[in-house]
């Protein structure tokens, strides 16, 4: 504890509040893409719009999905790779391939990679709880921008098939265009009343795009043959894996820290990402630590707390300040403390090399997604175990710290 106090005291030259803190993204920084009475899809603002320190996150976007019981996200595909993590609730995810279909029953803590272009649909199979799902998207076409394509058209977005000419569609499906239009595409002309009522009903449920209500029987049909994540293995090449499938890497009476790294999972290795889940009990502290290579995007799923991050002055400035920053590079850099209150739905980013500490004012759960995960090391600056300062040799401690080496080791 002495080391932690000495370390923080030596860097608290100045501090920034939540509003000036570029590392915290409050829940109101999510933009709503789709919303109706059945649920919503929200997209967090671009990381690099907050600060130039996040330039390496330009091609990463964070989405949140939430839906009511017995609802379905209609089939679609996106030009981005995804890492999907279930924050709460139960759901059935179906992923389609040219000659295959895989369905998975997901629950809290499950994660899975969805390759770019995968056609998927997602059903809430929980009778009471509203599942929350987090997606880290990595676009493959244009950095930082992703585009979704629906198999079935809606009132606000046409099916991707509707973009083709009549001749191409007739040749592809080996039938006349009127039949294709009736079965697969939205009707454009007047129809008999019995068909119009079916269309009107379809447009009504699709009025706000992609989230629709389904029956209990339909949910059971979707989930009955679905596979579940393995609780004993994290090495699945394509199926879901659970963040708590192995023992925590850190654990004591104050909390638990679970983590799955690329070395343990092929899906994560493909994208060079790690995923972790951290439980911190009320009144407890995650000791000051930093990552050597990884940039970690953290979402608060439950509870409240405070986080402190040590950075350098002007890291809250955007790209328009680059010239001014270049002029200041040769001046002394002021070390600065950034503070923020944490609440459910908040997101914060921990750049590589930036020490951070988190205090829980109620039982706190965090989900982290680490970019540049390969060969990353987490270094603690305080504590009895894994404390990197304890590895400093005695003569160096005498020179580096104001206290004696004995006092530093205490």
Curated annotation (Swiss-Prot):
Cellular compartments per GO CC: aleurone grain; vacuole
Subcellular location(s) per record: Vacuole, Aleurone grain; Vacuole
SMART domains: Cupin_1 (SM00835)
UniProt biased composition (Low complexity): 225-238
Major site of localization recorded for this protein: other
Molecular function terms, GO-annotated: nutrient reservoir activity
Function recorded in the entry: Seed storage protein.
Family listed: Belongs to the 7S seed storage protein family.
Annotated protein name in UniProt: Provicilin
Organism encoding this protein: Pisum sativum
